[in-house]
Amino acid sequence: MDNKDSILQRIKKSVKTTDPDATVILYGSYARGDNRSDSDIDILVLIDKDKATRDDQKRIAYPLYDIEFETGFVISPIVFSKKVWETKHIITPFYENVTKEGMVL
């Protein structure tokens, strides 16, 4: 089984291969350091588009399935538009959580 840093680097490489301009942010229990053996790896991917589509989500997420299969870790990516994310018109608990504890990979 791979260690955390190795898996995070593989995730970043996979996303950047698919979208070189994307920003990859780790949040949740792995970012806080209180993950357990059954914790998933929460990833926010910000892309340079006006709006992230379902196709964008698939394009980013599908290559991560190989990493999940090979390592046994569950990866939970959320794809968002950088433009929408940075506008901050609506501050949600999710936004506050990622802003507070998120780590750019």
Describe the predicted segments one by one.
Residues 40-46:
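Short, aliphatic-rich beta-strand segments
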Residues 1-23, 31-33, 37, 48-105:
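Catalytic core of pol beta-like nucleotidyltransferases
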